[in-house]
Swiss-Prot record:
Protein name: Ribosomal RNA small subunit methyltransferase H
Domain of life: Bacteria
The EC number(s) this enzyme carries: 2.1.1.199
Binding of S-adenosyl-L-methionine, residues: G38, G39, H40, D57, F84, D100, Q107
Organism: Thermosynechococcus vestitus (strain NIES-2133 / IAM M-273 / BP-1)
GO cellular component, one term: cytoplasm
CDD domains xrefs: AdoMet_MTases (cd02440)
Function: Specifically methylates the N4 position of cytidine in position 1402 (C1402) of 16S rRNA.
Length: 290
């Protein structure tokens, strides 16, 4: 089945640290708020044979792959399709919560999803295909000022205005590599650059299309209320916009005691085996007894 590509691609980042963070216990109930390929959920279920996991994802292809990958665990894992900020939970019920933020390797490696400039594909970038807004709509219909604001706010792109001006002059742009080449030309980038010059623009578009930061803010506000007293929450972020939000929200929340003064990062061995882990940052907090 093609959707199993999600499972084969999903090497769970910071696996030992996640297990140490959540400390799965006998009979515990855990929330994997971004199940993706199912790697982290499988870790929890294998570590503690009597714990259970509610696994959710807004990407129906990822969820279908996770359901098949995790089928051997039977009814110890339940699935819910939707955004983690919209989970209908009204009371403390989880012993631990995990959120692995951002786009997965499987999503990046599927050309038709339009997340990556490594492939020539339609500018899509929707994590949930039911979302009516695509990256192409943003690129081709938003004003120069709106585009510049998106690139600066969500990509921290210092040449946002220059790039937006060129996009408006050259559009329509409907393909990933069209946009990537325009940005590279606009910035007069050297082919020897380690990071592609369009990286920040693509990040900004993906975050905007999926409203990732607004959704994360909702999750950070609601999720502490879903934890039982002494329950643990772990969030893996992949860029400073996410990490900053996690740090500030937890510090300001009286329901949480922050465990990690500084985020946990991957060591050189993990980075060599799983390059996606290079930018991963793990923060941990514990629900107080209040």
């Amino acid at each position: 089945m093609q959707d199993l590509e999600f499972s084969t691609y999903h090497q769970p980042v910071l696996a030992p640290a996640v297990l140490e963070a959540l400390q799965p216990k006998a009979g515990g109930l855990y929330l994997d708020a971004t199940v993706g390929g199912g790697g982290h959920t499988a870790l929890l279920l294998r570590r503690e044979p009597t714990c259970r996991v509610l696994a959710i994802d807004q990407d129906p292809m990822a969820l279908a792959a996770a359901q098949e990958f995790l089928a051997p665990f039977g009814d110890r894992v339940q699935f819910w399709h939707g955004n983690f900020a919209d989970l209908p939970v009204a009371e403390p019920m989880f012993d631990g919560i995990l959120a692995d933020l951002g786009v997965s390797s499987a999503q990046l490696d599927r050309p038709e999803r339009g997340f990556s400039f490594r492939f020539d594909a339609p500018l899509d970038m929707r994590m949930n295909p039911a979302n009516p807004l695509t990256a192409a709509t943003v690129i081709n219909h938003y004003s120069e000022q709106e585009l510049a604001d998106i690139f600066y706010e969500y990509g921290e792109e210092r040449f946002a205005r220059r790039i937006a001006r060129q996009i408006v002059a050259r559009r329509p742009l409907n393909r990933t590599q069209e946009l990537a080449q325009l940005v590279a030309h606009c910035l007069k980038a050297s082919p020897r650059q380690r990071i592609h010059p369009a990286t920040r623009v693509f990040q900004a578009l993906r975050i905007y299309v999926n409203q990732e930061l607004a959704v994360l803010d909702q999750f950070l506000a609601r999720s502490p209320h879903w934890l039982k007293p002494t329950g643990r929450i772990a969030v893996i972020s992949f860029h400073s916009l996410e990490d900053r939000r996690v740090k500030q929200a937890w510090r300001a929340n009286p329901l949480l005691e922050v465990v990690t003064r500084k985020p946990i990062v991957a060591d050189a061995v993990e980075v060599s085996l799983n390059p996606r882990s290079r930018s991963a940052k793990l923060r941990i907090a514990v629900r107080t007894s209040a």
